[in-house]
Amino acid sequence: MMNQYNVTYLSKILCLKTEILYKPFSIINRSIVNQYNIDVKYDDITSIVKIRHKTENTILVFQIFNESNVKYSPIEYDYGDPIIITSNLQHGHNRIPINMLYIDVVESDMFPTFSRLDSETIKIITSILQSDNKKEQSIKLPKVSENELSVKILYHKDYPLKYVRYYKNNMVTGIEVIDRSVAITS
């Protein structure tokens, strides 16, 4: 299941997770990968991805396993959780399905630009969604599944994710923002 190409593509996703670990409210896009040096040591059992920020010199190490063979123990500069390549979509920020790694999604033109919302913006959105009339139901935002790659990338243990803001270029109006609420699926 795991091969050199999958791990190389996954390393770019892990680069984005690294950005969120150090800067939880960063706007994520594919250009962030250029801020990091990525060292990939591929192995059939356990692959190691070492990510170093080019200017800040912070280091983070990810251990990557197939779902059938996880023997995790923390190492120096470790992320804190094993990254598991799974055969199908599963819950958990550290479980990446193999079908997301068939192509280099981060380099794709279809890769979105997105971010987590800060507490002030969440308050504003919540107040806009509330109806003044008690008889009317409040407005609901469209949902994004917790299994989506953007939600897995934005995971941060200290900042629970309630909303994801997507940014889309529009030739007429400039940048559009699209907010989605995170749906917990079971």
From Swiss-Prot:
The keyword Cell inner membrane does not apply. It is found in: Virion. GO terms for biological process: viral transcription. Coiled coil: none annotated. InterPro entries: RNA_Pol_22kDa_poxvir. Its EC number is 2.7.7.6. Keywords: DNA-directed RNA polymerase, Nucleotidyltransferase, Transcription, Transferase, Virion. GO terms for cellular component: DNA-directed RNA polymerase complex; virion component. It is an enzyme of class 2 (transferase). One of its GO terms (molecular function) is DNA-directed RNA polymerase activity. The keyword Isomerase does not apply. It catalyses: RNA(n) + a ribonucleoside 5'-triphosphate = RNA(n+1) + diphosphate. Disulfide bonds: none annotated. Belongs to the poxviridae DNA-directed RNA polymerase 22 kDa subunit family. Part of the DNA-dependent RNA polymerase which catalyzes the transcription of viral DNA into RNA using the four ribonucleoside triphosphates as substrates. Responsible for the transcription of early, intermediate and late genes. DNA-dependent RNA polymerase associates with the early transcription factor (ETF), itself composed of OPG118 and OPG133, thereby allowing the early genes transcription. Late transcription, and probably also intermediate transcription, require newly synthesized RNA polymerase. The DNA-dependent RNA polymerase used for intermediate and late genes expression consists of eight subunits Rpo30/OPG66, Rpo7/OPG90, Rpo22/OPG103, Rpo147/OPG105, Rpo18/OPG119, Rpo19/OPG131, Rpo132/OPG151 and Rpo35/OPG156. The same holoenzyme, with the addition of the transcription-specificity factor OPG109, is used for early gene expression. This is DNA-directed RNA polymerase 22 kDa subunit. It comes from Fowlpox virus (strain NVSL). The lineage of its organism: Viruses, Varidnaviria, Bamfordvirae, Nucleocytoviricota, Pokkesviricetes. The gene is OPG103.
